[in-house]
Amino acid sequence: MFEGPLQDLIDEFSRLPGVGPKSAQRIAFHLLHVEPADITRLQDALGAIRDGVTFCRICCNISREEVCRICADSSRDRSTICVVEEPKDIQVIERTGEYTGRYHVLGGSLDPLANIGPRELNISQLLQRIGGVLPDRELADSTPETPLYDASPEVREVILATDPNTEGEATASYLARLLRDFPDLVVSRLASGMPLGGDLEFVDELTLSRALSGRLTL
């Protein structure tokens, strides 16, 4: 254990995903030897994330504005919504060039062991976008105070692109059950070929492109 600010910095880095105690220590010691201007740039970048990044009020993607660039793009297909767990998953799908619709970010997946249920995810916002109603009573008290102005009865398909692991599959099954209450709505899931137990961000572009084009109706 070190003392004072150095140990405090190591402890903070250790809290980051994928950063263990040894990695945190290496990063902290690296920062001891960089130029003051580099420290200032790091401080500015951290402050910009806190003050300059928000969440799109339509799809819950990260954005610098009230509405993200994808939702604001009139050329995107409004009839299709691709549901993902995290904003990083959008970047993976966009790189395939296969999908031209819009997205909805859940903010995670159902995980009872971590006390993450439907109310902790952006599910009620998704249902409002599709038809402005909440078919599942357990979500009723999680409705945003400000209704989304993008409630779109023209949505014809929802693609469930949650991760192909236990939590992602459970989330997809839950959403598929909810979305059956919407008449004439097609609910689909990425086709087989996705590596089971993995995360969407680690799937190569060709595999993901094929999974999108060959998606299965639930």
Curated annotation (Swiss-Prot):
Keyword Zinc tagged: yes
Record-linked SMART domains: TOPRIM
InterPro entries: DNA_Rcmb_RecR, Rcmb_RecR, Rcmb_RecR_Znf, TOPRIM_dom, TOPRIM_RecR
A GO BP annotation: DNA repair
A GO MF term: zinc ion binding
Pfam families per the UniProt record, alphabetical: RecR_C, RecR_HhH, RecR_ZnF, Toprim_4
SUPFAM superfamilies: Recombination protein RecR
UniProt entry keywords in alphabetical sequence: DNA damage, DNA recombination, DNA repair, Metal-binding, Zinc, Zinc-finger
Toprim domain residues: 79-195
NCBIfam families: recR
Family under the similarity heading: Belongs to the RecR family.
Listed name of the protein: Recombination protein RecR
Native species: Corynebacterium diphtheriae (strain ATCC 700971 / NCTC 13129 / Biotype gravis)
Lineage: Bacteria, Bacillati, Actinomycetota, Actinomycetes, Mycobacteriales
Gene responsible for this protein: recR
